[in-house]
């Protein structure tokens, strides 16, 4: 089934277009990088649609709003954990101006760049990988519930109980990507489509 999806010429064109959008983000401003960081903080324990909607409500508050203003905007967006995420967003501002530097680390070693991102409160392995993929770095797996559902077809134990388990599943995903001659981040788009019928992520 996966191989059939990967061979679909029309879908491949859409995937490559999406990948090009990610790669263009590498050259984007620090403001764009920070917006993507906040989006990834918001996606933790939330749906992408819920996180994206919340980000639209926030607007420039991510840069200039107080913790109370951010929390209020998140509540108005119907977002879960508004107080916690407001605090994470405020604290993440200390990385504004440093994110493209992390990108330069990713140019030589994406795993090292992900480790740096893990120091940001609100980011786990999945969210840090998601951020890097959205900024054009395609060698890391975003192991979310859709990818775990994909793994359930092949593996008995696919729960992420630790960082080492994430690495283990990422290694399996990397092997599948290699067999299909695809970067890990591109295979992720195909699997996401296979499990949701959608391409955006």
From Swiss-Prot:
Keyword DNA repair: yes
Name this polypeptide is given: 8-oxoguanine DNA glycosylase/AP lyase
GO molecular function terms listed in the Swiss-Prot or TrEMBL record: class I DNA-(apurinic or apyrimidinic site) endonuclease activity; hydrolase activity, hydrolyzing N-glycosyl compounds
Top-rank taxon, per record: Archaea
SUPFAM superfamilies: DNA-glycosylase (SSF48150)
Species per Swiss-Prot/TrEMBL record: Metallosphaera sedula (strain ATCC 51363 / DSM 5348 / JCM 9185 / NBRC 15509 / TH2)
Keyword flag Lyase: yes
EC number of this enzyme: 3.2.2.-, 4.2.99.18
UniProt xrefs under CDD domains: ENDO3c
């Amino acid at each position: 089934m996966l191989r059939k999806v990967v061979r679909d010429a029309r879908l491949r064109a859409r995937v490559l277009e999406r990948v090009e959008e990610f790669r263009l983000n590498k050259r984007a401003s620090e403001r764009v990088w920070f917006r993507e960081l906040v989006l990834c903080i918001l996606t933790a324990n939330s749906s992408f649609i819920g996180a994206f909607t919340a980000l639209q409500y926030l607007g420039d508050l991510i840069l200039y709003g107080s913790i109370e203003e951010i929390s209020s905007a998140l509540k108005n967006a119907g977002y879960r954990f508004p107080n916690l995420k407001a605090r994470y967003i405020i604290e993440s501002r200390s990385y504004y101006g440093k994110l493209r530097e992390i990108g330069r680390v990713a140019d030589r070693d994406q795993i090292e760049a992900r480790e740096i991102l893990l120091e940001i409160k609100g980011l786990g392995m999945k969210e840090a990988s998601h951020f890097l993929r959205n900024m054009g770095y395609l060698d890391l797996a975003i192991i979310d519930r859709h990818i775990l559902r994909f793994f359930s077809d092949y593996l008995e134990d696919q729960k992420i109980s630790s960082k080492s388990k994430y690495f283990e599943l990422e290694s399996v995903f990397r092997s599948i990507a290699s067999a299909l001659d695809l970067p890990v981040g591109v295979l992720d788009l195909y699997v996401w489509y296979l499990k949701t019928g959608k391409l955006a992520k």
